[in-house]
Amino acid sequence: MRVLVLGSGVIGTASAYYLARAGFEVVVVDRQDGPALETSFANAGQVSPGYASPWAAPGIPLKAMKWLLEKHAPLAIKLTSDPSQYAWMLQMLRNCTAERYAVNKERMVRLSEYSRDCLDELRAETGIAYEGRTLGTTQLFRTQAQLDAAGKDIAVLERSGVPYEVLDRDGIARVEPALAKVADKLVGALRLPNDQTGDCQLFTTRLAEMAKGLGVEFRFGQNIERLDFAGDRINGVLVNGELLTADHYVLALGSYSPQLLKPLGIKAPVYPLKGYSLTVPITNPEMAPTSTILDETYKVAITRFDQRIRVGGMAEIAGFDLSLNPRRRETLEMITTDLYPEGGDISQATFWTGLRPATPDGTPIVGATRYRNLFLNTGHGTLGWTMACGSGRYLADLMAKKRPQISTEGLDISRYSNSPENAKNAHPAPAH
C-alpha cells in the first residue's frame, strides 16, 4: 500500500518512519529543501510529557488581558482580517474552564507519555543521536502564588501516574547547580525527572535518513497546491502541476493544514502560534543549564544541548507573520542573563521564529477523516517534538488496522463536530 505524506517536519518524518516500519510504501513531499526546516528547526528542545498542558486554562483570559500591557509578556495578540483567527480565539476561550482543562490535559499527557516511551524504544533500538539528555525538566516559580497554583497540575500528574518532585531552593540548586547564585529570585520548583531534551532538527534529519533506509522517498522543493477528491476518497495531490497518487494520504503540514482541508469541507481549527528562540553558544559549561528549566513567569524554556543553550517560548497570535520582533529577542536575552548570566555568549546568539500549529483545546488532531483514505497528523502546538514519535506510531497502527497502544478517545477531528459527515471512519476499537 502506497502512502503519500505531506510535510517533512518532525511530525511528518516520524509518520513516514513508522509507516515504513509497518510495511507501507511511503513518499514524503515538502516545499523546503530538507526535513525540519520550518517549525521543527529551532524549537525549545524539550520532550516534556508531564508539562503537556493546554494554553486554554482557568484564569488565562484575565492573565491575557494583563499580559497585553506588559513588556516581557508571554502572550501577544496582533489582530488580522482573517476570520479564522477570531473563531480560533473564541474556541480557545470556551476551553478555559476547569472541566475542559482537565479533559484536554489528560489527552495531551496520554499521547505525550506514550510518545516519550516510543522515543526511548527508538533510541534503544537504533542508537539515534540528537544531543539528547534524560535528566528531567524543572519548572521554576518566582512567586508563592505560582507554587500554590501548581497544585492543580500536580493532581493531574498523580492521576496520570507521572513521577514528580516539589523542590525548595536547595533542591533547585541540587538539580541545576548554576541556579544556586540566583536562588533568591525563586521560591520553589516542580521537577519531572522522566522528561528529556534534545535537538529536534537534528533528530528529524537523522530519522529521515533512517526512513530512507527503510525505503521512504523524500521529494523536496515541491509546491503542494491542492487535494483532488471525489465522493469520500482522495484521488491525488496536485504538486508542481503534477497529480501524485497513492492509496492513502497523510496531512502533516502544521499550521498550513487547514488551507488544504477547507475545499474538502473539513474544518480543522489549527492556527499558528508564533514562537521565538535564541541559540546561545556555551562559554562556561558549569554555569549553563544541566537539562531544561521552565520559567513560569515568562513561559520560557531554557534547554542545554552539547555546546549550546536553546532559549524558547512566548506566543504571538498574529497569523502567518514570520518577521523577527526585536522586542522578543530582548525578552529572551533578559531571561537568559537573569538566570544564567555566566553560561553563554548572548552576543553570538542566533534568533529564530516559527509557527506552532495549535488547536484551541491543545490536543493535536491525529487520525482518520470522513474521507476514507485521508488521515491527519497536525495541530501539536508547542509539543510537536514531545508528541512526534507517539503520534507517528499511533497513526501507523490505525492505518495498518492494528489496535493502538493507547486510547483513541478525543484524538481525531470528530471531537470538533457533531455532524455525521465529519465522523471518523471505522478503525480498531480504543485500547481502553
UniProtKB/Swiss-Prot annotation:
Gene3D superfamilies: D-Amino Acid Oxidase, subunit A, domain 2, FAD/NAD(P)-binding domain. FAD binds at residues 3-17. Pfam families: DAO. It catalyses: a D-alpha-amino acid + A + H2O = a 2-oxocarboxylate + AH2 + NH4(+). One of its GO terms (biological process) is D-alanine catabolic process. Keywords: FAD, Flavoprotein, Oxidoreductase. Its EC number is 1.4.99.-. Its cofactor is FAD. Disruption phenotype: Cells lacking this gene lose the ability to utilize D-alanine, D-histidine, D-phenylalanine, D-serine, D-threonine, and D-valine as the sole source of nitrogen. Pathway: Amino-acid degradation; D-alanine degradation; NH(3) and pyruvate from D-alanine: step 1/1. GO terms for molecular function: D-amino-acid dehydrogenase activity. It comes from the Bacteria. It is an enzyme of class 1 (oxidoreductase). One of its GO terms (cellular component) is plasma membrane. Induction: Is highly up-regulated by L- and D-alanine. However, it is likely that intracellular L-Ala is the signal for induction of the dadAX genes through DadR binding to several putative operator sites. Residues 410-432 are annotated as: Disordered. Belongs to the DadA oxidoreductase family. HAMAP family: DadA (MF_01202). NCBIfam families: PRK00711.1. Catalyzes the oxidative deamination of D-amino acids. Has very broad substrate specificity; all the D-amino acids tested can be used as the substrate except D-Glu and D-Gln. Participates in the utilization of several D-amino acids as the sole source of nitrogen, i.e. D-alanine, D-histidine, D-phenylalanine, D-serine, D-threonine, and D-valine. This is D-amino acid dehydrogenase 1. It comes from Pseudomonas aeruginosa (strain ATCC 15692 / DSM 22644 / CIP 104116 / JCM 14847 / LMG 12228 / 1C / PRS 101 / PAO1).
